[in-house]
């Protein structure tokens, strides 16, 4: 799947190789949140930190290990959404992990770890495509989708992507 251009604030970027140790820090433009990509040369983890707390570590996701990734040139980027509550990690412009500080939830392509604790990501770190929405530009259907959502019941599901808008609904919702 090819993703459109990311519509968010780029705060950190680094070229690297899997076998290289490094730390890439991406401070939120506003507030106390920080997203960090750290590699020890064998594994790469993406961390959610909140410097306003006594224990800043909030959550973490495995991004790669040496066995699962080719040791070649990559570019990592950390983005923040408009209200500085969600961080996105891309590698070679492909979304790999997202932290939502408001919902206390994280997801990544590896889905690992299943869960770190009860306060963040209680359902684990499986990839959630919907979490990417805050980092993508508006689709051509944005206004139409908003109007349709107002008209449809809670039984409707919308998939608002470019180039298509999919609306699934239960016919009984319109009969009741």
Please provide the spans of the model-predicted regions.
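Long, intrinsically disordered, low-complexity acidic/Ser/Thr/Pro-rich regions
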Residues: 2-23, 152, 163
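Surface-exposed loop/turn elements that mediate protein-protein interactions on large endomembrane-trafficking
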Residues: 3, 46-68, 98-118
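Loop/turn residues immediately N-terminal
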Residues: 94-96
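Short, well-structured hydrophobic secondary-structure segments
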Residues: 24-71, 77-79
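Acidic, proline/glycine-rich low-complexity IDRs
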Residues: 99-176
